[in-house]
Amino acid sequence: MMTLRDLINKLLGRETASANTARERLQLVLAHDRVDMSSLTTDLLDKMRKEILDVVAKYVEIDFEEVAVSLETEDRMTALVANLPIKRTLTGEIEFKKNEDTQKKK
């Protein structure tokens, strides 16, 4: 299973990808066997969704209108599935900001 870190590293890599490939790469599946579903309230799921989006949005521009987060259960496994369509990566802007901050310190 690909970790979130692996996914972000792939997305921020030098290779370019089509929108569909990026969409597939950003489909995060966080699964755990025997999850106590009663503890996953609507408020908790909303908070998780917001936190996931906040972290991913630091690295890529997300199409927030197309974001889909859901819980899927199959057999004895429950998965939190997040489909986060990417508009573009923000690596250039991040590097620019780092350079700008470095210049200010001099």
Curated annotation (Swiss-Prot):
GO biological process: cell division; regulation of division septum assembly
Gene3D superfamilies named among the record's database cross-references: Cell division topological specificity factor MinE
Keywords: Cell cycle, Cell division
Highest taxon listed in the record's lineage: Bacteria
InterPro entries in alphabetical order: MinE, MinE_sf
Family according to the record: Belongs to the MinE family.
Function noted in UniProt: Prevents the cell division inhibition by proteins MinC and MinD at internal division sites while permitting inhibition at polar sites. This ensures cell division at the proper site by restricting the formation of a division septum at the midpoint of the long axis of the cell.
Name the record gives this protein: Cell division topological specificity factor
Primary gene name: minE
